[in-house]
Amino acid sequence: MAIRILIPTPLRAYTEKKESVLLEGNTVGELLRGLTATYAPLKKHLFDDTGSLRNFVNVYVNDEDIRYLQKEQTQVSEKDTVSIVPSIAGGRS
């Protein structure tokens, strides 16, 4: 079953400028690992040196933050859409 993963603008440079990618997987973790296997330069932007999802990378399944579900073990199905949303900090101090 193919799941759509939405790629944010700042990360499209690493996915051949694709706005979304269809991948096979049963969990968010499987999808993210498949994504970084297909687009290797993306890995360092999503995962740290220990293989953990970076703290500033937010992942949603149909608008639900996976941190409040089962994190990377969150199950997905064909009707789901996974969104990657990197946190952006800024402003004046």
Spans of features found by a protein language model:
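Ubiquitin-like/PB1-type beta-grasp interaction modules and other compact soluble beta-rich domains
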Residues: 1-93
